Amino acid sequence: MLRKCAIALLIAGLATGADAAPYRGGSNYGWFGIEGCSREPYGVVANYHVAEDVVKAQLAEMAANGQQRLRIGIFHARNANTGTVIPSAGGNLPEQQRQNLLNLMKAAKEAGFVEIIVGFFPLLDNAPNTWTGSTWTAWHEDYFQENWNLVFNLMPIMRAANVKFLVDLGNEGIPAQGSSTLWKQYASKLWWNFSHVFGLSETVGFSMPTNSADRIAMLPEIYAANPPYVLDFHLYGAEAQQLRAIDAGLARIQYPQGIVIGESYYDDANSASEIASAIPGMGRPVYFTLQWPLTRTSPCSDVNIAPPSGFSNYISRGL
């Protein structure tokens, strides 16, 4: 069982009480522009080298509006190159995008951000939730090794940025109880590798999707006796109800960890109110909230805001 005394985020002066006020959050910052609902040409990691001035100005605006934390996505697939999705063949990003990640994290720190979650978004055949069958084959091992080596090779770059960071090993990557055996094997193997090589202090494990309280029962199977110190949940709608269910589910498996909200609707007054109202009744802290650049009523499926400069509704609720 995780010892409570070991729970630590990479945040100076972290309070661990369940009634501790949340730390100031911020945004998922993945795109510096958008056309209608199309985000693909504008990925910040893919294109930082050609949009540096724009990105730095946007970071400065976000920080001036009170944001203190970011989540940056590494969208990758073996042979894809969309302007957001970056090729990861061989278990690494191209040299330019590796430099972009380093420069982006440094720029965020210079703008005043104090912590970054770096989330890995494996797509296409790199995404284990798309794998079919029940037997782990050489094909699955090949893609697993690509994804693992990508994390392994980017860790020194993230550390070199000299800003506090946490790694999300797979966006919404905790399988449900009814998910494929292959996905469960993938998550367990990747967690074992990361936790044994890099430890627990620089990761949230795998983030969990909205309405995912049922997946909490899978955490002991994925993390075994070595779970992360903090967990990442995404909330879209009925946030107070979801937080209560998450808190109860974690208590049932005897996980004392605090959580972060890694995604929520963009600058949404109702989301902020629901999150803030639920926190005092929880048996664990909610450290901070990160908004996704999508408004509640948008017809877009993924993103409709770039940059995500506003955060006032969350700030007004102490988030």
Where are these regions (language model features)?
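Aromatic-lined substrate-binding rim segments of carbohydrate-active enzymes
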Residues: 52-126, 148-151, 155, 183-204
